[in-house]
Amino acid sequence: MLFRSCHGYKDSHIGMLPLAKMYADMKFNILLPDLHAHGLSDGDDIQMGWKDRDDVIRWIGVADTLFADSTGRQRIVLHGVSMGAATVMNVSGENLPQSVRCFIEDCGYTSVWDEFSHQLGEQFGLPPFPLLYAASALCKLRYGWSFGEASPLAQLTGKKSQMLFIHGTSDDYVPSAMVFPLYNANPKAQTEHGGVQRFNSIWITPGCAHAKSFHDYPAEYGRHVRAFLEEKGFFQ
């Protein structure tokens, strides 16, 4: 079993070590690479989890080689926090090998546009027009993607991703309201008895600021993660 982490904005693999310890205690192998333009990775400009998804997919291939068991099989969970959570959601919308079993996103945003629009209003009291429109157009010219295009919500919509969503109620950096459209983007499936089966789960942490759910509720965090992983076939 493998835990592959995705850290947050201007963080590095170091910031994911507490989560790595939680997974190590559950007997997971650990892979802690840095995202583009962070830590020890190459690059000068942060890609907000959009182009990073391609790097993560390549790392999955590396992990399948390094950590497969004696039968060649592998079970991977991708777990991201903040921008890393957005990265994980972006990855979940791509065609992935069967070794990737599930995803955990902690306080990720619906899209780069939504997050930048929120920050522009909160920090500077400015509307999206014209600054955000101009910046998005420049990003498209320089990096090949726009702020609206970089959308975890779009990546999740209609996909049967096995995902645990975590968000704090007092998050004013990535508003907690963003988690609900993300959670509801995943389709429901009818059970054979006419009930409804969800492919994902959600845990809202009371009073937690941005990216503080594990810090504030370490034991509960571990229990929720383990229960989700057990449901998805780990530990068997």
Question: Where does each model-flagged region fall?
Answer:
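Conserved alpha/beta-hydrolase
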Residues: A20-D42
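Short, small-residue-biased leader/transition segments that mark boundaries at the very start
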Residues: M1-L2
